Amino acid sequence: MQNLELFEKAVVMILNMDGWNLHHVGGMSHYDAVGETPKKIPCVLEIKFRNTYYPTKMLEQYKYEKLMQENKVALYFVNDPKGNYLFWLNNLKMPDPIDMYCPDTTLWTKKKLLKPCYLLDESMATIVNENEEAKPGVWDSYFNKQKK
């Protein structure tokens, strides 16, 4: 859980370097950061890190409803092995929810619960940064020779 919070804080810091004014909330809040967009519009941000790539990004309906109740710009940031995706939820026509088995929210159990979720297509994201495969650099052959 501690590493996850460090990753969330890193996303907040990177967005702040790009003109945002966000503060990490942490804890049991319904969102991970609160603040302002670069245009000074109040916002809340939910951040998810996924270890596996899927072409659709899952957002629990409950989480979506809690974000929308804040009456601020609601944002959903997803990082997975293929890239980073930022969804501006207020502007989206949400698909019909689908019941999916999701981890229980308590930390001391491994059971899964059936929860209604939205599956957001990557094309619905406003900002997409795709990760690139690492390519050999100019110094790689030199350092490979040094290892032998």
Where are the regions a protein language model picked out?
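Acidic-basic catalytic patches of nuclease active cores, encompassing PD-(D/E)XK
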Residues: 1-27
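A general structural detector for well-ordered alpha-helical segments in enzyme core domains, enriched
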Residues: 11, 63-66
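Non-catalytic C-terminal interaction segments of nucleic acid-processing enzymes
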Residues: 13, 17-21, 36, 72, ...
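A structural signal for short, well-ordered beta-strand segments and their strand-loop junctions
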Residues: 24, 44, 75-79
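Short acidic/glycine-enriched loop/turn segments that link adjacent beta-strands
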Residues: 27-30, 83-84
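Conserved catalytic cores of phosphodiester-cleaving nucleases, focusing on short active-site segments
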Residues: 33-35, 39-51
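Active-site-adjacent loop/helix micro-motif of nuclease/hydrolase catalytic cores
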Residues: 51-64
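Arginine/glycine-rich "motif VI" loop of SF2 helicases in the C-terminal RecA-like domain
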Residues: 67-71
